[in-house]
UniProtKB/Swiss-Prot annotation:
Belongs to the RapZ-like family. It comes from Dictyoglomus thermophilum (strain ATCC 35947 / DSM 3960 / H-6-12). It comes from the Bacteria. HAMAP family: RapZ_like. The keyword GTP-binding applies. ATP binds at residues 10-17. InterPro entries: P-loop_NTPase, RapZ-like, RapZ-like_N, RapZ_C. Transmembrane segments: none annotated. Keywords: ATP-binding, GTP-binding, Nucleotide-binding. This is Nucleotide-binding protein DICTH_1001. GO terms for molecular function: ATP binding; GTP binding. Displays ATPase and GTPase activities. GTP binds at residues 61-64.
Length: 294
């Protein structure tokens, strides 16, 4: 995707830090409480990485000196660079912000000016009123859960890139049960019911990445049927995991030694899922039995 800039501002206690964490999980390079004057320089540094950093998200708040003037100048500079950007303004009801500060025991940035918490909130609203007019998106988080906040940010990002949910990561790991289950697995599929190439002396020295072994495993109807069942199951499950707010799904596929059957099946599932999702493939134990024929 093209380089994108996401600027978060708004009321203290409205969810700016949580929004930044969400964007970090989505692959953005994130900086909190940065002066507006530094943002154009930071953009140039990110662009100089030749695509290694594809998105920048920053939080800018009222603690910055000359906030309004510098913010306007920053927006003009970004516009001149012809870079797509969003300005998200977060707000919430006064009572909700007071409750959040009481729960976290943090200090509102304007309390240092000798104000009460409510006076600080009202003063901040006044100072940010003009900044709010620059916002491309305004979100009231008063009734939001963390999932609600993430869903709204994803909707905003979809105007950058319709495939923003590709930041959801799936890992597929083949493994051998005799070496233990992957401890981070969310879904585990056991393929030890399939005929084992290990018992064919001609196939034993090869791994499931070899055409001979792959053809042997996939020639079995039960293997082909199993792959289709798993595909259908994942078509059902993966969108639900995404809706639930998960950022990563770890799938483990195991056979006895993790060298033959699991490798073949993992390759097939990877080929299918990688057409739709950001998917990584690992063959954890494929080389552990490589000298077994000796």
């Amino acid at each position: 995707m093209d380089f994108q800039v996401f600027i978060i501002t708004g009321l203290s206690g409205a969810g700016k830090s949580q929004s930044l964490r969400i964007l970090e999980d989505l692959g953005f390079f994130c900086v909190d409480n940065i002066p507006p004057k530094l943002v154009p320089t930071l953009i140039d540094l990110c662009l100089a990485t030749n695509g290694k950093i594809s998105g920048l998200a920053v939080v800018i708040d009222i603690r910055t000196e000359n906030f309004l003037e510098d913010f306007k100048e920053m927006v003009d500079t970004i516009n001149s660079k012809n870079i797509p950007f969003k300005i998200l303004f977060l707000e919430a009801d006064d009572e909700v912000i007071v409750k959040r500060y009481n729960e976290t025991r943090r200090i509102h940035p304007l309390l240092r000016e000798g104000k009460t918490i409510l006076e600080s909130i009202k003063l901040e609203k006044e100072r940010l009123q003009e900044i709010k007019t620059f916002a491309t998106d305004i979100i009231d988080t008063s009734q939001f859960s963390l999932k609600d906040l993430k869903d709204n940010i994803l909707k905003i990002l979809s105007s950058f890139n319709s495939s923003v949910k590709s930041n959801f990561l799936i890992t597929i790991t083949s493994f051998g049960f005799k070496y233990g289950l992957p401890i981070d697995a969310h879904l585990v599929f056991d393929v030890r019911f399939l005929p084992n190439p290990f018992y064919d002396p001609k196939l034993r020295p090869f791994s499931g990445q070899a055409e001979e072994v792959k053809n042997f495993v996939l020639s079995k109807k039960e293997a082909r049927d199993f792959i289709e069942y798993v595909k259908n199951l994942l078509d059902f499950l993966v969108p639900l995991y995404q809706e639930e707010g998960r950022n990563i799904l770890n799938i483990a596929i195991g056979c006895t030694g993790g060298r033959h059957r699991a490798v073949v099946i993992a390759d097939e599932i990877f080929s299918y899922l990688s057409q739709k999702y950001n998917t990584h493939l690992f063959h954890r134990d494929v080389d552990k039995d490589r000298n077994i024929a000796k």
